[in-house]
Amino acid sequence: DMARIYSDGSFMILGRKDNVINSGGIKIQAEEMEKRLQSLIDVPFVITSVPDRRLGQAVTLLIEGRLHLTAIEGRIQAVLEPYYRPKYIRMVNHIPRTENGKINRAECRILAQNLHLGGKEE
């Protein structure tokens, strides 16, 4: 796990190290971005990445269901700095989960890559 330690001795858990997206040299913690977007998106969603020639990894937002994309993009622009904003937003039928109901990040990454390459959601 990764944490931010403050000068007063308190700390905040940011998420798992393996969920860090390196996009153009900027380290983006997927769970931290999800927390920032939680109040804006009222359906299940996940931040993941796809390979990108220029950036290394491109931040990708998978959203369960069908929402108005323009409205979502406007909300995201209002709360996230440009370098944190998802480069791609994809609507999916469902967010892959483990047997315990947690987000299956490995499957989400594969799904995002398949959709990015023009494949279909399975």
Segments from the language model and where they lie:
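AMP-binding/adenylate-forming catalytic core of the ANL superfamily
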Residues: 2-84, 94, 107-110
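Acidic/polar alpha-helix N-cap and adjacent early helical turns
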Residues: 111-122
